[in-house]
Amino acid sequence: AEVVTDEWWFGFEQEYFFTNPDGSPLGWEKGEPRPQGDYYCGVGADNVSGREISEAHLDACLAAGIHLTGTNAEVALGQWEYQCFGKGIKAADDLWVSRYILYKIAEEFGVGVNIHPKPKTGDWNGSGMHTNFSNEEMRTNGSEELFSAMCDKLGEVHAEGIAAYGSDNDQRLTGLHETQSIEKFSYGISDRGASIRIPIANVENNWKNGYLEDRRPASNADPYKIIAHIVGTLTK
């Protein structure tokens, strides 16, 4: 899309599960593990499974010139996330290639990758691809009115956004597990249960310098469609 210039910055939070050859999540070989709670950003062999694969992927992406800004163990055992930053359409290019590299690295370790938004039913978090974004005005001349107006614009086309944000997302966006219901749209400051989270840093910066986090995209979403929807909506 020609409107997507390097003025637009994107940070994708790609979540996924490492899987065994039988399709079960890594670390679930003896059946369902204890309830989630200790796994998020966890340490220790009883709390984490697959760190060496995640770190090999990080190293490979950095060597390829892809700007990963971090990785972390996620809420469920065997679930991971990495953050991929880029400017303009290159953000989607890099996210797409980073996924390819992830599958290749995982293959070398004899495991698979599952980017379905809800691979395990029950009281387990799904996998999303929260999309953080900003443009020049948001970073240098923001205001509470500006950020609220942007959220309202995205809310007006919520159905179109959901259509662009990946398949089977209804299984993840239930209103539970740090999500808003797929049927509803909301935004709020530091609200992990909202469709759009307004970072507390925006408030701390007196709204002059900030960004927004769209929490609706699924882990299997097409990053080009996400960018096209966000920029297309906010530049109308």
Segments predicted by a language model, with ranges:
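Glycine-rich, acidic/polar active-site loops that bind/position phosphate-bearing ligands
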Residues: 1-236
